């Protein structure tokens, strides 16, 4: 009788072990499936993915991105010194982090980073999108934008500029989309303010343009809020029929956001989940 009790106990233990192993394997498989599902790039009907960066590498991909370096205001009276140091730009937990810091560096009192795809990955027509979490604070100026590939040999604004997203820290519920070109630049640029009823910096949002030969449309979380047609420029030249390169940066101070606030918290981070370019 005692023998049978021992056998039954051993069988129960074996069954319990099998159940536990099954649960462990199942959880591991589900986790792997969930990760793969999260990492999958959604298919956009009618579009083909041309190039992208999911920022899932250990370092910033030098085959996609290079850096603008230095200070001098960048034509806007900005206060930062742009570097390529990991303190200012790095990959962290599957995201690009652009970090603005309050520190004395090369004669400036602030540092940040400005990444670009110039001469590496350029775009002529298509959908250009990024999922970004912007920082908030007086004087912060995160942006996702593009310049014409002939920028180095052509005066601005003749090269053309497409501002997919600019966020001004002093107005946390607001983003701006703008088109700059010859005769319509700076304060005369073709632009649209897009105001929300919440702080945009609280969460990630998707910013995009869809660019065609005669029209550019702006999107915020897949909702169109602005468009410019070639015919809207009247006698001014449409310069958006050539390749452009992508720029991601976090500026400090300058003409648009105004002075940096005394209570603006540093370091301040701009997080970029991905950049994707689709074409038809």
Regions found by a protein language model. Name each.
Residues 1-8:
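Short, Lys/Arg-enriched N-terminal segments with co-localized hydrophobic residues
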Residues 23-27:
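Hydrophobic core
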Residues 12, 16-19, 29-280:
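GH16 jelly-roll
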């Amino acid at each position: 009788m005692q023998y049978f009790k021992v056998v039954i106990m051993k069988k129960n233990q074996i069954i319990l072990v099998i159940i536990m192993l099954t649960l462990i394997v199942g959880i591991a498989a589900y986790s792997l499936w969930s990760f793969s599902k999260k990492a999958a790039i959604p298919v956009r009907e009618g579009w083909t993915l041309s190039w992208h960066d999911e920022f899932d590498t250990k370092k910033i991909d030098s085959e996609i991105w290079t850096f603008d370096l230095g200070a001098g205001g960048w034509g806007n009276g900005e206060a930062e010194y742009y570097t390529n140091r990991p303190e200012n730009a790095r990959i962290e937990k599957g995201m690009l982090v652009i970090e603005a810091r309050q520190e004395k560096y090369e004669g400036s009192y602030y540092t940040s980073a400005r990444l670009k795809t110039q001469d590496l990955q350029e775009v002529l027509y298509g959908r250009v999108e990024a999922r970004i979490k912007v920082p908030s604070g007086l004087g912060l100026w995160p942006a996702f934008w593009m310049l014409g590939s002939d920028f180095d040999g052509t005066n601005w604004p003749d090269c053309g500029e497409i501002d997919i997203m600019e966020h001004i820290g002093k107005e946390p519920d607001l983003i701006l989309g703008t088109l700059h070109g010859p005769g319509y630049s700076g304060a005369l640029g073709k632009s649209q303010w897009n105001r929300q009823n919440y702080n945009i910096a609280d969460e990630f949002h998707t910013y995009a343009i869809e660019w065609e030969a005669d029209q550019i449309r702006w999107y915020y979380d897949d909702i169109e809020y602005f468009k410019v047609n070639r015919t809207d420029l009247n006698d001014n030249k449409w310069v958006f029929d050539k390749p452009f390169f992508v720029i991601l940066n976090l500026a400090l101070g300058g003409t648009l956001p105004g002075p940096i606030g005394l209570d603006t918290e540093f370091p301040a981070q701009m997080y970029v989940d991905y950049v994707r370019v689709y074409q038809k």
